[in-house]
């Protein structure tokens, strides 16, 4: 394989630039030409395919977002869209593609491989909801951003003896809420994978203030409901505390990636090029126990929920490549 391309698709994630940089520099070291596909699959169909060199990716390892830009392009799920994209790949002599994104991006990579263009998927999403990898590119940065914001909110919450419901991102997965909640000593962590009773939370808030607590921090995954709706339900269930709600929003998708995300992205990008060099396609790169691994894209893109909660309070990880997480009481005070 002499000529490959790289694209980013779907929602952006800190560390994508580091992954692109690794792909480009490893490809050059392997004697390959590398092209950047701008604007994801939409750019592929439109022919926005341009050569990249070492200088193209200089000084981007510390930058958030993706300099190749990203876009959602549902039309690529249809055969017509796929054939248009393949026509452009052939026109530019592309023999393999590295796709950085989430599960929707993986479906596109799977289609490319089926049409004879080996594609490698790299898990680029802050949600950490990709099967077959312990961590995704961008997750660590998103958790760190959420942690920093929650720490600041705790300060003002304590000053005014307030209850805060803080909504974090994650789509249908509760990973960001779980990690950020534990890291900040949140009083409650509400995630889609675990049930909760509103009256129990109200009782916990009341008991906390009665014993002298100066604040109450509830970290809520967006996949459960919005912070505004959750706050309203708290009041309907009898909460009388001074309540505020905050949605952290897209701040979690931006910013300079952490060292962990930069290194993870660099390792994954390098590994992807080595696989393409060997003519391997149709796989997604992951990390398990700090080692690079590959999983079939088909299974990776089509698995269901990553973990669920048993009646005993144990989180069972449906993804066999993630370690079980033991929490004695997920929705009790962790502070």
Swiss-Prot record:
Allosterically activated by ADP and other diphosphonucleosides, and allosterically inhibited by phosphoenolpyruvate. It is found in: Cytoplasm. Substrate binds at residues 125-127, 162, 169-171, 222, 244, 250-253. GO terms for biological process: canonical glycolysis; fructose 1,6-bisphosphate metabolic process; fructose 6-phosphate metabolic process. SUPFAM superfamilies: Phosphofructokinase. InterPro entries: ATP_PFK, ATP_PFK_prok-type, PFKA_ATP_prok, Phosphofructokinase_CS, Phosphofructokinase_dom, PKF_sf. This is ATP-dependent 6-phosphofructokinase. It catalyses: beta-D-fructose 6-phosphate + ATP = beta-D-fructose 1,6-bisphosphate + ADP + H(+). ADP binds at residues 21-25, 154, 185-187, 213-215. Belongs to the phosphofructokinase type A (PFKA) family. ATP-dependent PFK group I subfamily. Prokaryotic clade 'B1' sub-subfamily. It comes from the Bacteria. It comes from Streptococcus pneumoniae (strain CGSP14). Its EC number is 2.7.1.11. One of its GO terms (cellular component) is 6-phosphofructokinase complex. The lineage of its organism: Bacteria, Bacillati, Bacillota, Bacilli, Lactobacillales. The keyword Ribonucleoprotein does not apply. Its main location: cytoplasm. It is an enzyme of class 2 (transferase). PROSITE patterns: PHOSPHOFRUCTOKINASE.
């Amino acid at each position: 394989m002499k000529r490959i391309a790289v694209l980013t698709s779907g929602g952006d994630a800190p560390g994508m630039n580091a992954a692109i940089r690794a792909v480009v520099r490893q490809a050059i070291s392997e004697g390959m030409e590398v092209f950047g596909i701008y604007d994801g699959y939409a750019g592929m169909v439109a022919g926005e395919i341009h050569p990249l060199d070492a200088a193209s990716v200089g000084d981007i390892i510390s930058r958030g977002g993706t300099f190749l830009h990203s876009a959602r392009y549902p039309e690529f799920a249809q055969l017509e869209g796929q054939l248009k994209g393949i026509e452009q790949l052939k026109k530019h002599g592309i023999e393999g593609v590295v796709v950085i994104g989430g599960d929707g991006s993986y479906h596109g990579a799977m289609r490319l491989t089926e049409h004879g263009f080996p594609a490698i998927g790299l898990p680029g999403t802050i949600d950490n909801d990709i099967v077959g990898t312990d961590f995704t590119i961008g997750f660590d940065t998103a958790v760190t951003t959420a942690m920093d914001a929650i720490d600041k909110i705790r300060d003002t919450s304590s000053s005014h003896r307030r209850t805060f419901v803080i909504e974090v991102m994650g789509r249908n997965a509760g990973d960001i809420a779980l990690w950020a909640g534990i890291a900040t000593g949140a009083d409650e962590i509400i995630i889609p994978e675990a049930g909760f009773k509103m009256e129990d939370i109200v009782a916990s808030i009341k008991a906390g203030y009665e014993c002298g607590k100066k604040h109450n921090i509830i970290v809520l995954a967006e996949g459960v409901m919005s912070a505004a709706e959750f706050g309203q339900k708290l009041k309907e269930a009898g909460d009388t505390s001074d309540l505020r709600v905050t949605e952290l929003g897209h701040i979690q998708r931006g910013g300079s990636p952490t060292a962990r995300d930069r290194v993870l992205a660099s390792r994954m990008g390098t590994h992807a090029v080595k696989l393409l060099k060997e003519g391997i396609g149709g796989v997604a790169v992951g990390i398990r126990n700090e080692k690079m691994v590959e999983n079939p894209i088909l299974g990776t893109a089509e698995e269901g929920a990553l973990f669920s909660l048993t009646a005993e309070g144990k989180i069972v990880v449906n993804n066999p490549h993630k370690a079980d997480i033991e929490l004695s009481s997920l929705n009790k005070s962790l502070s």
